[in-house]
């Protein structure tokens, strides 16, 4: 190694473990995501990350910027979490009714799944995605069910779902004389 390369290497900021502290400019598999502060061995930094433009030397200025950005993201995440918890409280107060064809014993001819629950919620003015509805299996009988709704990784809600028989048209059940 030449004298200038050695002196250049000595000027690089060292991390706590003797490696070089870098700020990732792009996501790097098995290392971190864009904006992460990472510590890597000098060879990895000098021969790959820096020449490829995947990272830059982490200065005190960069560290302050990253910390400010993380604080903003934490505040935004806390607001989202608060909003999801409020939505969960509202959903817990709600109940929806879904009509389905059933036999005399209360067994449904079909079943009620996430699609039907989302449609019933949409009719009530609540928009959710089908993958947020957590059922152990389709609902196949008449009755009251408590359905889990996944709003956020830290927030789940409960919703009461009534599955009731479809009201027959005038004259009673089809096929009745």
Curated annotation (Swiss-Prot):
Disulphide linkage map: none
Entry keyword annotation includes Ribosomal protein: yes
Segment forming the signal sequence: none
Gene3D superfamilies documented for this protein: Ribosomal protein L9, C-terminal domain, Ribosomal protein L9, N-terminal domain
GO (cellular component) term, any one: cytosolic large ribosomal subunit
Gene Ontology MF terms: rRNA binding; structural constituent of ribosome
Example GO BP: translation
Domain of life: Bacteria
Keywords: Ribonucleoprotein, Ribosomal protein, RNA-binding, rRNA-binding
Function: Binds to the 23S rRNA.
UniProt similarity note: Belongs to the bacterial ribosomal protein bL9 family.
UniProt-recorded name of the protein: Large ribosomal subunit protein bL9
Organism listed in the record: Rhodopirellula baltica (strain DSM 10527 / NCIMB 13988 / SH1)
Protein's gene: rplI
């Amino acid at each position: 190694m030449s004298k200038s390369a050695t002196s250049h290497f000595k000027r690089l900021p060292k991390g706590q473990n003797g490696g070089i502290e870098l700020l990732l400019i792009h996501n790097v598999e098995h290392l971190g995501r864009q904006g992460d502060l990472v510590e890597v061995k000098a060879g990895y930094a000098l021969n790959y990350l820096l020449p490829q433009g995947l990272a830059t030397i982490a200065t005190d200025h960069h560290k302050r910027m990253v910390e400010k950005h993380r604080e903003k993201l934490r505040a935004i995440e806390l607001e989202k979490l608060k909003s999801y918890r409020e939505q969960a409280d509202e959903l817990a107060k709600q109940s929806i009714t879904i009509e389905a064809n059933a036999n005399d014993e209360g067994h449904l001819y079909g079943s009620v799944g996430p699609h039907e629950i989302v449609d019933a919620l949409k009719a009530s003015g609540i928009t959710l995605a089908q993958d947020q509805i957590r059922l152990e299996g389709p609902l196949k009988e008449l009755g009251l069910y408590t359905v889990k709704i996944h709003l956020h990784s830290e927030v789940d809600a409960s919703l009461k779902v009534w599955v009731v028989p479809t009201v027959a048209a005038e004259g009673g059940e089809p096929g009745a004389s």
